[in-house]
Amino acid sequence: MNEQGKAINSSAESRIQLESSWKAHVGNWLLRPEMRDLSSFLRARKVAGVSVYPPGSQIFAAFEATPFQRVKAVILGQDPYHGQGQAHGLCFSVRPGMPLPPSLLNIYKELEEDLGLLRPDHGCLLPWAKRGVLLLNAVLTVEDGRAGAHQGKGWEGFTDHVVDTLNREREGLVFMLWGSYAQAKGKAIDTRRHLVLKAPHPSPLSAHRGFLGCRHFSLCNQYLSQHGLGMVDWSLPPCIALDGAILNGRIAV
C-alpha cells in the first residue's frame, strides 16, 4: 500500500467509534470495502429521511459496555428492535421506561424459574453487559417499523468476525444461542474451548418448545465457576436504582 493509502486507512480507523480493546482485535474489519459500502448505505438512508435505530452513537454499545477481556458470556440476537425509542445497542434490551417486549418477558420468566430472581420493572440489560455478558446482535442497525431491513448489508460479516475472534483468542466462554438463527451463526464455535448452550428462541412462538426450562443462566454460572472466570450476577436492580451516570451516557440511552 502506498503512503496515501496508508494515510486514508489511518484516518478512517481513527473515526471508528469502537471501544479500544475491541478495536485492537476486530477494528481492521471495519476498514474493509463492504463496511465502507455499509456506511454509505446508512448515510443514504438517513439522508432519505428514514429513521435508523439505534442512534449512531449507540451502534457499538455492546462493545463499549463489555470490553474484549471482560467477556464471560455471549448472547446472540438477530437485529435491533424496530420501534421508536426501543433499541440502544444491546440485544434483547430496551431503554428504561419502554414496555417489555414479549421475548424479554420470557427471558425474565426463565430467569425467575432458574435462579429465583424476580422480574425487574424495566427491560434494560446494561447491568449484565457491564458484568461481562456481550449482548450482540448479528445486525447492528434496523429501520423504523421494518424488522430485518438491514440484513445482508454487511453487518453479518463483521459480527461473524467478532464471534470467530472470541472463539479463537479467548477460552472458557459461554455462548448462549437461542433460536436457529443464533445457532447457525455460532456453528463454528469450538466446543472443546467453550460451552455452547442451545435452546429455542424466547419468542412467544417458540419459548414453550424448550426455552422455558432450559436453565441456561445457572448452567452458564456453573461452567464459569469451574473455569475460573467468576459467575455472572444475573440480578437486575429496579429502574430507580439504575446508575444514572451510565444511563445518561452514549452506551445506554
From Swiss-Prot:
Active site: D79 (proton acceptor)
GO biological process: base-excision repair, AP site formation via deaminated base removal
Protein name stated in the entry: Uracil-DNA glycosylase
Keywords for the protein's UniProt record, in alphabetical order: Cytoplasm, DNA damage, DNA repair, Hydrolase
Function: Excises uracil residues from the DNA which can arise as a result of misincorporation of dUMP residues by DNA polymerase or due to deamination of cytosine.
PROSITE patterns found in the cross-reference section: U_DNA_GLYCOSYLASE (PS00130)
One term under GO cellular component: cytoplasm
Domain of life of the native organism: Bacteria
Main localization of the protein described in the UniProt heading: cytoplasm
Pfam families tied to this protein: UDG
Gene3D superfamilies, per the entry: Uracil-DNA glycosylase-like domain
Lineage of source species: Bacteria, Pseudomonadati, Pseudomonadota, Gammaproteobacteria, Lysobacterales
EC numbers for this chain: 3.2.2.27
Known catalytic reactions: Hydrolyzes single-stranded DNA or mismatched double-stranded DNA and polynucleotides, releasing free uracil
SMART domains in the cross-refs: UDG (SM00986), UreE_C (SM00987)
